[in-house]
UniProtKB/Swiss-Prot annotation:
Organism: Macrococcus caseolyticus (strain JCSC5402)
Keywords recorded for this protein, A-Z: Cytoplasm, Lipid biosynthesis, Lipid metabolism, Phospholipid biosynthesis, Phospholipid metabolism, Transferase
Cellular component aspect of the GO annotation: cytoplasm
Protein name stated in the entry: Phosphate acyltransferase
Gene of this entry: plsX
PANTHER family according to UniProt: FATTY ACID/PHOSPHOLIPID SYNTHESIS PROTEIN PLSX, PHOSPHATE ACYLTRANSFERASE
Annotated InterPro entries: FA_synthesis, Phospholipid_synth_PlsX-like
Function description: Catalyzes the reversible formation of acyl-phosphate (acyl-PO(4)) from acyl-[acyl-carrier-protein] (acyl-ACP). This enzyme utilizes acyl-ACP as fatty acyl donor, but not acyl-CoA.
Amino acid sequence: MIKIAVDMHGGDNAPDIVLDGIEMFLKEFNDVEIHLYGDEKENRINHPRLTMHHTTDVITMDDEPVRAIRRKKDASMVRAAESVKLKETDAVVSAGNTGALMAAGLFVIGRIKGIERPALALTLPTINDEGFMLLDMGANADAKPEHLVQYAKMASIYAHKNRGISNPSVGLANIGTEDKKGNQLARDTFNLLKEETSINFIGNVESKALLNYAADIVVTDGFTGNMILKTLEGTANNIFKMLKSTLLASTKTKIAAGLIKKDLMQLKNKMDYSEYGGAILFGVDGIVIKAHGSSDKKAFFNALKQVRQSAREDVISLLKQEVTHE
């Protein structure tokens, strides 16, 4: 039985969407147990495979991450992370404060021996519906070439086991596709990735090609990765806003909007990265998944489903074995 620790109070719409997502998840899968951490008075789920763990504190979006983890010992997120550290559960998922969850992963659960820097990875949509994994998205603003090689190794294992890609391709985010393009970090990383035989490195990829499925995995430093993510997210949101404004501009366009409303919703859902689950924190000694802060129940369900798959494939053991050669 897979045991998943859930922070009941993480996210903009907690605890309602968290509980709704859990109910969907327990109904869909019978090989999982949920360990719910939060205020027991706010839990409305009575299920034989759900265990409630009462906590008295909450980490908010405004809290300073490391300070909150160290001072709020009875916070739902901290207690959930501790359960993974103590091997009482297999994974933790939260839609709460991203920095705090990363801090909980590092300082409560702990880093895998041999991993120098953790990385936050998220699967983003592509035009062909396959999606690609981007990392690092902000766990570390600065990185060395060796760190990016480790990112590529971890993501390759994950893509193979979780997404069923037999030989996932790895691209390096850069300002051009030529071998010598980019700053010193990009050039040095390119050379190391090219020499690494355990991954399928295909070279540099430009940001304009990402949504066209340039690679299964794209690695970069956390500063650049976060900029790419925010740019893609903002561009998609603004395109839909402009499209909506155009379609509501006149009677003629309103009629057209009514005719293609279903198709537009399908397109919007296609570009919603929460359809792929949450972001995974690579490099810590346990499965840590960050659901989107504004998740609805389906997005939280997808994050739980992602956790289940990672636990079923024993991803952490594989990372230890293949990345650190333990």
